[in-house]
Amino acid sequence: MDRTLSLEFARVVEAAALRSGRLLGRGQKDEADGLAVDAMRQAFDSVRISGTVVIGEGEIDEAPMLYIGEHVGAGGPEVDIAVDPIEGTNLIAKGQNGAIAVMAIAEKGGWLHAPDMYMEKICVGPRGAGAIDITKSLTENIQNVAAKMGRKVDEINLVMLDRERHYGLMKEARDLGARIMLISDGDVNPAMECCIEGSGVHMVVGTGGAPEGVLAAAALKCAGGDIQARLKPGNEEEIRRCHEMGVKDVNQVLTLDDLVRTDDVIFAATAITRGNLLNPIQYFPGGARTHTIVMRSKTGTVRFLDTIHRDEKLTTLKAR
């Protein structure tokens, strides 16, 4: 993909964040999500790609826009797109930290077509890459990652969703002496954060959404991190969907290269609320300021865009 597309993709996630961020703290998660979807879909109209949504808002009968299989873009190279217009709709509704607008783009056929079900994951940044094995205990993984990173176990920070299903993992990590940062929603954001030195996130573990696992893998692919995962179908219907998506063995350990099947990936995310890495949207009379990360796997480049937007210039977000 042309590297100049990186800025175009940044504008897409900025549009989603700017539109939905107006509903911060107002308890309207569905309305915020709708605004983000509308803005993202509109912004795609000016991007010079022929894109197909592979991971999006749901099946064609579940979502009016950005549904799986929808074609977007103004024409150009064929790409597959993974989007989450808002990761953390509850976070926006409650005015809490960690909400982002996020997308990733790969050459055609570049993504695992992850079904909408649970996925067990373990993620690390570049310094921990190669040290994880999802078939081993959390204790072994923490110890191996700590050794690879040159840290003591009690200096390792793990992020996991605050869910009852993770209580056993929490106890195991704490008994070992590792530190846990619990989050209420959204595991793409911390996976992105563990890629960057100084974010304070070293590992992301636990079970979350499978589509989010692919987006997390995109960030890790771009920045040199690592992930292992396993799908966790809950019934026969979900097993059937795994088979339809090309996953014949639902117990298969999925590596980074299984989730992201190309070296040509661009990842972009804009903060809506504050994170460990990105600053929140700041609105002011006549405009706003956003903080965006854009990563490209071919070069390993990570860019942070601190951007001022003027309302009178942003009527349509069409190419200028």
Language-model features, listed with the residues they occupy:
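N-terminal subdomain of lithium-sensitive/metallo-dependent phosphomonoesterases centered on the IMPase/IPPase/PAP
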Residues: 1-82, 143, 147, 174, ...
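General beta-strand structural signal in soluble alpha/beta enzymes
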Residues: 53-57, 81-83, 92-94, 113-114, ...
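Short acidic, glycine/serine/threonine-rich loops at helix termini
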Residues: 65-67, 94-96, 114-117, 168-174, ...
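A generic local secondary-structure boundary/capping motif
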Residues: 70-71, 89-93, 145-150, 170, ...
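DPxDG-like acidic metal-binding loop motif
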Residues: 77-87, 91-111
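Acidic beta-strand-loop-alpha-helix segment within the catalytic core
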Residues: 102, 107-182, 245-248, 275-282, ...
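Gly/Ser/Thr-rich active-site loops/lids in small-molecule metabolic enzymes
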Residues: 178-188, 201-203, 208, 212-243, ...
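A two-mode feature
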Residues: 236-277
